[in-house]
C-alpha cells in the first residue's frame, strides 16, 4: 500500500480509530507515549467529559457527522428514562447538546474564531505521514 492509499484510508474514521490507524502514531498517541507509555494503544475509557468534548469537536469541524451521537431527553444519566434508551451506551443528554450548541454559536459569532475555523485556507481532519527515523 503506498502513502496516498494509506492517507485515503486514514480519512475514514473507522480506519483511523481502529486497528489500521493504530499502526501509526497520532497526536494522541504521542501524548500517551510521554505520559503513559505502557498503555499507548489502550483505548480511552469512555466518560461524559470525553463524549461532550467529542460532540463539540464534531459540532464545529464535522457537523455532518453529528447524527452518530445518540441524544437522550433526560435530566441525568441516573434516571430510568436515560437507562431505558441508553442501556450500557454512554449518550449525550439533551441539555448537554443545548450547551454545546450554545458554545458553538458563541465561538462562531467571534469573527477571528470563525475565520480560523472556516476560512478559505482551512483544511482540517487531514491525516499526514512523516518518517521519524
Each language-model region and where it sits:
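Metal-dependent nuclease catalytic cores that hydrolyze phosphodiester bonds in DNA/RNA
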Residues: 1-133
Amino acid at each position: 500500500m503506498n502513502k496516498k492509499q494509506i492517507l485515503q484510508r486514514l480519512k475514514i474514521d473507522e480506519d483511523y480509530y481502529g486497528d489500521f490507524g493504530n499502526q501509526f502514531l497520532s497526536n494522541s498517541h504521542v501524548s500517551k507515549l510521554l505520559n503513559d507509555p505502557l498503555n499507548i494503544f489502550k483505548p480511552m475509557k469512555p466518560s461524559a467529559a470525553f463524549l461532550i468534548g467529542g460532540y463539540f469537536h464534531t459540532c464545529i469541524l464535522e457537523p455532518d457527522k453529528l447524527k452518530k451521537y445518540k441524544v437522550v431527553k433526560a435530566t441525568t444519566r441516573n434516571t430510568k428514562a436515560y437507562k431505558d434508551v441508553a442501556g450500557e451506551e454512554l449518550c449525550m443528554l439533551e441539555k448537554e447538546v443545548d450547551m454545546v450548541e450554545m458554545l458553538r454559536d458563541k465561538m462562531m459569532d467571534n469573527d477571528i474564531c470563525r475565520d480560523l475555523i472556516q476560512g478559505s485556507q482551512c483544511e482540517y481532519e487531514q491525516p499526514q505521514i512523516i518518517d521519524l527515523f
